[in-house]
Amino acid sequence: MIVDQNVAFAPAKINLYLHVTGRRSDGYHLLDSLAVFAEACDVLRYRDGDQAAGLGLQLEGPGAETLRAEPDNLVLRAGRALAALAGIKPRGTIMLDKRLPVASGIGGGSSDAAAALRLLSRVWGVSPAAEDLHRIATSLGADVPVCLEPGTYRMRGIGERLEALPAMPEIGLLLANPGVPVSTPEVFRNREHGFTPEATLASRWPDMAALLRDLQLSRNDLQPPAMRLCPAIGILLHALEGLPGARLTRMSGSGATCFTLFDHPDAARDAAQLLQAQSGMGGWCWGGGLYKTASALDKTTL
């Protein structure tokens, strides 16, 4: 059950591992990744309006100053594409509370676009076929399809080939960003030559120990080049590894956000408070659990 029909959450996407497995003739890299979603999220709210005014976007929150409500914003592009598919005129205003850091390796913009598709489908009363929605999502970006229905996924291809996996065991997640944006194209350009085979994964993970066994045999191929471009990532990873109860620490996506796994969400919250209290810790930090459903989020999120 949705808490509010006019509200949608855009949770952070975390790549627990990321292997670069090849490269297409058009230059796009092929990936193999295990993606989950955290309770940390942006929040989208819809206010109805006149069709003559079209669809508008208002930005607020900590990350708003780094974005612009211009026509090429992914949220507006998603709305226009959905309206075109449904044969209607886009209308209303989306208020985007930007809480996640921008250009940080956790799919914030992609998740915002996917949340906009879910939200506008609901408030405009349209029911696009799943394949049509997936096609729109893919046209917006390789990371948008996985964000349509947040869960646990194996991502392949350029990110558009998705395999839904069984739910994760309960784990804690600490996310931290040093406050330095990292360019994804630059990270790929600075990657060493060669490719990594796809990871071997179990069919399910009954507990944290089973999950860690698989993750310890994998890696993030983009972490070394990102660390060369942004030394603050290495400093942050070292700090995360030293936190009490830390089980696995790694960078997500192309950075600069890093994560640490804990046995329980409460342990991750405690560690986040400790990290924030440490001298010199700037940027952004969050601790909690995995995203389950919109209604499962604490109402204080709103």
From Swiss-Prot:
Record: residues binding ATP: P101, V102, A103, S104, G105, I106, G107, G108, G109, S110, S111
InterPro entries reported in the protein's UniProt record: GHMP_kinase_C_dom, GHMP_kinase_C_sf, GHMP_kinase_N_dom, IspE, Ribosomal_Su5_D2-typ_SF, Ribsml_uS5_D2-typ_fold_subgr
Segments passing through the bilayer: none
Single Gene Ontology MF annotation: 4-(cytidine 5'-diphospho)-2-C-methyl-D-erythritol kinase activity
EC number(s) on file: 2.7.1.148
Active site, per annotation: K13, D143
Keyword terms of this UniProt record: ATP-binding, Isoprene biosynthesis, Kinase, Nucleotide-binding, Transferase
GO biological process terms held by the UniProt record: isopentenyl diphosphate biosynthetic process, methylerythritol 4-phosphate pathway; terpenoid biosynthetic process
Function: Catalyzes the phosphorylation of the position 2 hydroxy group of 4-diphosphocytidyl-2C-methyl-D-erythritol.
Protein name per UniProt: 4-diphosphocytidyl-2-C-methyl-D-erythritol kinase
Organism this protein belongs to: Granulibacter bethesdensis (strain ATCC BAA-1260 / CGDNIH1)
